[in-house]
């Protein structure tokens, strides 16, 4: 799906949709970093501020969002169609044993963003090895993995409450430290 589905419109989707029960804004944007910062991270940070009056996560998260470009040096990003919420609970098999993916939150984005739910997906080394035989592994992939998990931790914080806040805050703090911000 990632290799064969490129977008001429840029990053986004022709309609907004949802990620779980949270609205997911998909306005077309020509730059991936701008799209991810504004429509994924900043949107979720605003929800956290509105729902929980959480100014700490909002301010620190905003600082990270303004500096995302530092994590994408020498990275070529082509928009490809993403499932958007890929984890073990959204994968099943039909009666013939063929895989079926459920409950998509589709948009065109950076292929690495697909792994944002890896913390509950059960993807092991064999999965990643097979994937990167087909798709080129970009420089800095390991350093960006948590960045894509952050979106989903923030979304879970907004949907399910404070149990997910510490994971999101830890990722933000780690990136602020890594980037000397």
Regions found by a protein language model. Name each.
Residues 24-37, 46, 75-81, 88-146, ...:
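Active-site Asp-x-Gly
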Residues 65, 69-73, 132:
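Generic structural signal for well-ordered alpha-helical scaffold segments
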Residues 55-68:
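Short, conserved active-site entrance elements at the starts or edges of catalytic domains
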Residues 44, 64-67, 153, 171:
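A ubiquitous structural signal for well-ordered alpha-helices
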